[in-house]
């Protein structure tokens, strides 16, 4: 999995157009002559315009020229014709000049995949079966809205190893709001009613994000916040003075200063200006004073168990020494100043918001706490500290080479805690944390079925610790543990930390390759041993550096180049030792010059040890992420077993849009 690597048809079209204009006339003339000659030899080509074909040749990866949902036969013909042109031009000064001009245009436009000095991946894509793959919106398990909900890492990994579309929790929550069951939810309604009845403070946290499909909605959704406030203030008539909100600023899955700005994105959708939106929402209930704390997500949602970040988040709510601002007015002035000084939302330090003469709110013993963010990985540390789950925190931090002191954690809080989702099973079973929407593992997950079709074998998961849950909980189909104790080997490399200057996720530009080399070394060693029939790996840098665009463009380019070198090595060794390779991505990110994920397609490439695989015929030349597991099953020779499983669950509709199918013809 190349985390966060998609491609933008719109931006590629602009690069193609401008680069064509910038080509020296002798180069474009030679390319047109070659294109005309190829068309004469390929009478089946749909478009007979030599310039159309010549301009396609400007884009390094041929499949990225295809429109979304291209008719299968037309796409095949277009790719074959383009392949003939590039073969005729290969090794000539023409293509060298084309590459130079195209890269210069990509540098001007900050289009990382072409701006990077990286030709290995393009060559791998063009030499093997490569197909556009849907990775957002409905095809990522979200609501079918326009514009689509951006793809993200957790759902992408869930889809990649599922045999059918894996529905996501945000859709389930939204459906419960629409049918009214949200307001009768046993755990949510219960914790609110207990707090109101006992006149105890009701504290809650929410990431300011997710108004529409493309401005977040990765960890939170605005309609979930609206519904919760309705539950609190309309259904249960809570006193706003006893409701305390921690508002987390995003700037990663939404524009980096969107707490204060309200940009219109490429889809014409307005998002951002979240602080103003929040003030208006709270004002409906006379509850502006309920905003108690502000903090950036890099401290409030640290998933790599960096103690200084988790401590700052905890102490800001429980009574540590925290900066203060006076009301929404003071908050807006402070954020404007911080943005002017170069801070992005994710790096905003913790602040308590004071209202009138009241002192800063503090979480105290016996209070209630609700977490309104639905994605598990970035809520675990927060909820574990509030629940006093030292064993869990020690285990997770030690696995990343970190040793916590815990001197700042209180032992007397005994909070009544409810999460919107189930963040970790141990939080419920050992520490009494409730989940409004309990976790339901995906039934049709390839890895959970692995022991049934390969009982004597093991598969290998490899990644680094910032993506530990992706190479674990998410890729297993929302399972904390493998199906059996001996079917899985997992190797997680600790991500860079404080010693390398990486205090939080905003610092990864300092080592943009991240742990790509170490992961590659482990993959090479594993393939050389020929021990595992199936190996799954995550290369994280393209996503992690994509989140730092446009500020750290050069570092993003370096991250891409590191992945390009790694893939060349991985593919070479895989072929040497008889492995097939499937290269795909969980979602788009680094191809757009913004901090957030994209709704763009990704590419899936399937490589055989020898020769070239053929695309399995389908209506359109377009895959879905949940086609990958069927492709792997076909390569492993267990397709029949997977079909029997689907039939046994009553879901044998193999032609349906929500059931996957192999990308390749039988191997």
Predicted feature residues:
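Amphipathic, non-membrane alpha-helical rod segments
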Residues: 75, 79-85
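Feature captures the catalytic ectodomains and active-site-proximal regions of enzymes
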Residues: 1-14, 29-33, 38, 47, ...
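Structural helix-adjacent loops and short alpha-helical linkers that scaffold large soluble proteins
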Residues: 68-71
């Amino acid at each position: 999995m190349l985390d966060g690597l998609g491609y933008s048809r719109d931006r590629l079209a602009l690069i193609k157009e401008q680069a064509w204009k910038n080509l020296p006339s002798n180069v474009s003339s030679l390319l047109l002559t070659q294109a005309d000659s190829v068309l004469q030899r390929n009478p089946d080509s749909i478009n007979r315009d030599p310039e159309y074909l010549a301009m396609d040749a400007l884009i390094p990866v041929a499949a990225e020229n295809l429109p979304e949902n291209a008719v299968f036969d037309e796409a095949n013909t277009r790719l074959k014709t383009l392949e003939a042109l590039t073969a005729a031009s290969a090794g000539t000064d023409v293509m060298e000049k084309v590459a130079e001009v195209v890269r210069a245009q990509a540098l001007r436009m900050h289009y990382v995949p072409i701006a990077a000095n990286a030709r290995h991946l393009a060559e791998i894509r063009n030499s093997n079966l490569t197909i556009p793959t849907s990775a957002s919106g409905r095809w990522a398990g979200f609501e079918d809205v326009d514009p689509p909900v951006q793809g993200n890492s957790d759902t992408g990994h869930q889809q990649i190893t599922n045999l059918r579309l894996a529905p996501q929790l945000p859709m389930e929550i939204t459906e419960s709001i629409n049918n009214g069951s949200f307001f009768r939810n046993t755990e949510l309604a219960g914790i609110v009613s207990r707090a109101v009845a006992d006149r105890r403070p009701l504290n809650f946290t929410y990431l300011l994000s997710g108004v529409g499909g493309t401005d977040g909605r990765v960890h939170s959704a605005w309609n979930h916040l609206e519904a919760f406030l309705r539950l609190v203030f309309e259904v249960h008539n809570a006193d706003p003075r006893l409701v305390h909100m921690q508002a987390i600023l995003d700037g990663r899955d939404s524009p980096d200063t969107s707490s204060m700005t309200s940009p219109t994105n490429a889809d014409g959708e307005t998002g951002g200006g979240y602080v103003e939106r929040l003030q208006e929402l709270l004002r409906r209930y006379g509850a502006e004073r309920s905003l108690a704390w502000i903090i950036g997500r890099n401290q409030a949602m640290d998933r790599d168990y960096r103690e200084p970040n988790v401590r700052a988040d905890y102490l800001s709510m429980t009574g540590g020494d925290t900066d203060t601002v006076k009301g929404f007015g003071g908050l807006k002035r402070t954020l404007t100043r911080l943005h002017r000084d170069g801070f992005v939302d994710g790096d905003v330090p913790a602040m308590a918001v004071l209202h009138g003469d009241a002192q800063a709110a503090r979480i105290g013993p016996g209070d209630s706490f609700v977490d309104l963010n639905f994605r598990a990985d970035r809520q675990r540390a927060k909820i574990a500290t509030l629940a006093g789950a030292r064993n869990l925190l020690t285990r997770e931090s030690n696995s990343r080479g970190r040793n916590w002191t815990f001197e700042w954690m209180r032992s007397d809080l005994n909070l009544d805690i409810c999460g919107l989702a189930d963040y970790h099973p141990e939080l419920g079973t050992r520490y009494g944390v409730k989940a409004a929407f309990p976790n339901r593992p995906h039934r049709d997950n390839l890895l959970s079925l692995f022991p049934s079709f390969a009982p004597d074998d093991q598969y290998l998961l490899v990644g680094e610790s910032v993506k530990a849950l992706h190479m674990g909980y998410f890729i297993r189909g929302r399972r904390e543990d493998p199906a059996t104790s001996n079917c899985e080997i997992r190797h997680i490399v600790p991500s860079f930390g404080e010693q390398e200057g990486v205090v939080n996720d905003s610092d990864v530009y300092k080592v943009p390759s991240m742990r790509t080399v170490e992961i590659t070394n482990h993959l090479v060693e594993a393939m050389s041993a020929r021990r595992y029939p199936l190996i799954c790996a995550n290369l994280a840098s393209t996503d992690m550096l994509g989140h730092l665009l446009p500020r750290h463009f050069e570092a993003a380019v370096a991250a891409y180049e590191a992945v390009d070198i790694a893939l060349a090595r991985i593919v070479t060794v895989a072929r040497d030792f008889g492995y097939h390779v499937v290269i795909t991505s969980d979602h788009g990110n680094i191809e757009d010059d913004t901090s957030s994920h994209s709704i763009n397609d990704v590419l899936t490439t399937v490589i055989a040890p020898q020769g070239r695989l053929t695309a399995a015929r389908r209506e359109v030349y377009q895959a879905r992420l949940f086609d990958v597991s069927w492709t792997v099953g076909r390569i492993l020779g267990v397709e029949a077993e997977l079909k029997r499983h689907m039939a046994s669950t009553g879901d044998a509709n193999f032609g349906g849009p929500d059931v996957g199918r192999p990308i390749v013809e039988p191997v």
